[in-house]
């Protein structure tokens, strides 16, 4: 007889023919997800998706109670512990609290109404006093102290039995190892182990460094919660100690008092807030945001205030928790279905959700940057419906390996642009192709290039590309460029949006009728702009060059190019080597100039501008004096103390030297840093001069002095 692995990766849900089949499918899927979440610490869906499936099963069981089975996930808190850790049976079960699915203000109102009804209160009775707390997104923990000494730390597990992780928890410096003498002889403190956002980012930075260095088996963490859970359940405490964990206390489990303290008529604490204050006095961290709230109105105010602060907190929360403050009233209200009637978790809209990638579109920004964007099946996340999520750049898209048709986790926090967090590769369609960035701009067809050391591809058709049109016009009209007085942001927006201007030459084709038809453009203003356009036709070569918006060509470089070559045609036709002969022009700038003028679209726009009457006085090329390192060939190898290889290369080339990629008999100098390798060995074999960075700087300085 075939058996089904309940903990196998679940298949995508489908709608069965009957409630019994649907309930069986949901139980299997929830068991599998609970196993991956609680046991393996490898969740594949966001919490919100698990909650949705769980709620669907609860609703079906309420509608068909005869189909309820003892093995249903609704009849227990969580999953089983791993065999590698010793099992711990909780003296007082670590039960979960009810989640209020209504994320609006009415969620708090609903809870208060239930409490007042349970306590038999009417409108004439005063508001119920609550404690409002944060709901941390971490790992629940029970800390057992005997005679003031930490003797055991255990995870929640299934609520009845957890795992002992004492050695790992001892590494968290916020958790006291010994309590003051006034603490009870036996005290179980309940709280949350979590990781601060800054610590999480620092940890992932270290992971990325390890991966870049070739370390095997290393990976980055999806979120702080996963990182914290993985650290707590490390078998090696030394590894756990390297993970920056934190802790907040929010309650107690078993408490055994001294004989003189155990007075039913005069309890050691009468309220939940008194309990938290006692924990704080014994050295446990308690969240500063915890406060007393009277009635539904103050619960609503707390929920709204924390929602506004949520993204600025140094740690993740996914909601707030309300608890009846009086311990006597808590006892009176009791539990239902293993959940306390006197507490509720009031969540915020989920910041992560599952959805499907319908396509990947490459968008072009105002400055020519190409950004891959995932087009998504609409999903409600972070309080809004999301249909697009940035993939940032080619490296990031490939690292996450996002493909069309993939099921992905998308995240949106606050006003942050939605992004794809991770992919569920087991749900990938067969044959889905990998994403690759286009080598031509999707808007204008010009070459898209990625410069060395940069993450982004950029369109090289700056003068022609529709996506860059507004930015190109504004830059051209800048007072330090060609200068067109009166042509500002708002007017450019109007002209481009109305399709009056498509390229720069269209500026000089504007007439009074077209301008006067624009909103808030009086005839006088239109005439003034036309005069400014006519005036701008007479400019200088440096201003015109700067106005073209060539990447890396600022005002100073434009002046040097004009001085060196004397005329625009010579600059447009200059080779890489000829450009490198210009003062302060290195390989990156030279390549950028060459790439710009290699695009036929850009040359066409330049010729059209000249045909419209834009002109300047051209001169003779400057006499080219030999540079101090002309004729010298350098090879740079290893890591230099202060300069990157590109910086060292630029300095050598600016002084007239040539930088080669390999050592030969024609090499004059090898500039060697640490870990120089085979190039240094070959230089020594050939008897070529080997210098360090300091010697290179002295050589450059002496060459300049000559």
Curated annotation (Swiss-Prot):
**Highest taxon of source:** Bacteria
One matching Pfam family: HHH_2
Cofactor(s) it depends on: Mg(2+); Mn(2+)
| Residues holding NAD(+) | 47-51, 96-97, 133, 156, 192, 323, 347
Reaction catalyzed: NAD(+) + (deoxyribonucleotide)n-3'-hydroxyl + 5'-phospho-(deoxyribonucleotide)m = (deoxyribonucleotide)n+m + AMP + beta-nicotinamide D-nucleotide
Kindly list the positions annotated as binding Zn(2+).
Answer: 441, 444, 459, 465
Instruction: Show the PANTHER family listed in the entry.
Output: CHROMOSOME TRANSMISSION FIDELITY FACTOR 18, REPLICATION FACTOR C SUBUNIT 1
In Swiss-Prot or TrEMBL terms, this protein is called DNA ligase
Q: Which organism is it from?
A: Polaromonas sp. (strain JS666 / ATCC BAA-500)
